[in-house]
Amino acid sequence: IALQCYKYGAKSVTIGYRNNPMGFKWPEGMKEVHYLDKLEGSKAIFKDGHSQNIDALILCSGYLHYFPFLADSLKLKTHNRLYPPKLYKGIVWQDNHKLFYLGMQDQFHTFNMFDCQAWYARDVIMDKIKLPSDSEIDQDINEWVAKEEKLQDPLQMIDFQTEYTKDLYSASNYPKIDFELIRKHFKDWEHHKEDDIMTYRNKSFSSPVTGTIAPLHHTPWSQAMDDSMETFLESKS
């Protein structure tokens, strides 16, 4: 969102972070400061003491797990993390095996992970996957959480979530997909962002299903001001 604002003409963009800065090499006119503490008219005062006048404020809450329609005994309560506790295989509610949560994790993998979760949940519902004993479920959750808590950087996080998704994949008949290629793509993508946050979108990757390499977009992202499908699909020599 911050980069979109910058791209389309904002003279300055200030990002207030909740816990840790993203730490990318921002272009001139963009910066990160500790989160917004209070507003006094048009003046924003941040937790680190920094203050400045602002024209617009965009509240980005991040992923918040909020299930007011569930009883407390069924409610997932967690911050945004790669392995929320009390979910066996990241899916099955530990205290009630008829309740399934999908997509609750902080994400590198997205739809391929969601698919594997859905396949796994389907097979539990259809009794194709037999859940282990309560003690084994507890041990499995604790082992995954312990691994997650030792992660120190994005590359380790990519490895962790790849292994988690592969674990789900191995338990069902999900169609063939190249997880090692996905792992490599994510790490390349992470390096591209670290190298230049303004140009990482200009890269091309191959499909982990077909192997087909996607064509590069005809216009660098920072110069592409028209997001219509007609312009996006246009061929330019």
Feature locations, PLM:
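Post-kinase regulatory C-tail/linker adjacent to protein kinase catalytic domains
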Residues: 135-144
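Flavin (primarily FAD) cofactor-binding/catalytic cores of flavoenzymes
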Residues: 1-134, 149-237
